Amino acid sequence: MSAGGASVPPPPNPAVSFPPPRVTLPAGPDILRTYSGAFVCLEILFGGLVWILVASSNVPLPLLQGWVMFVSVTAFFFSLLFLGMFLSGMVAQIDANWNFLDFAYHFTVFVFYFGAFLLEAAATSLHDLHCNTTITGQPLLSDNQYNINVAASIFAFMTTACYGCSLGLALRRWRP
């Protein structure tokens, strides 16, 4: 009892006062039945191929292709984490605006992947450039490295397009 004789009500439990998470995508395996889930799976597949192809070319131009490797590896793991959170149903337990987080993630990765695609295409276009380190003037990229970089450029474009489609879908969910 307080000095005035009236009892003070207990403070509200903070666990009950949080609003529910805002997410319109389904949690669990149902995420794979949506366009967004399919695009995330394609992002992981194509992004992994970009990572593997650039690494298998022995990264002849580390200044350009180092960024491509960083973006593809980082986006690959964050997309796996993103998909894993939806598959496990953790999005229903974490209070966040998942629609905004989905949009912000795909916007950021789209911008970075677009830059990585441009750098990979630029590295591939240097195939006919000759090195001045030898008297014979060997090309900067061997024919094998050139072919691998062409494939990496194509898959980087496809991955960028998938992130762009996911960005459009996320924008529709975030701002209906």
From Swiss-Prot:
UniProtKB keywords: Cell membrane, Cytoplasm, Glycoprotein, Membrane, Transmembrane, Transmembrane helix
All ranges on the Cytoplasmic side of the membrane: 1-34, 88-102, 171-176
GO cellular component: apical plasma membrane; endomembrane system; extracellular exosome; membrane; membrane raft; perinuclear region of cytoplasm
Main location per the UniProt record: membrane
Topology with respect to the bilayer: Multi-pass membrane protein
The keyword Cell membrane is annotated on this UniProt entry: yes
PANTHER family from the UniProt entry: MARVEL-CONTAINING POTENTIAL LIPID RAFT-ASSOCIATED PROTEIN, PROTEIN MAL2
The protein, known as: Protein MAL2
Organism: Homo sapiens
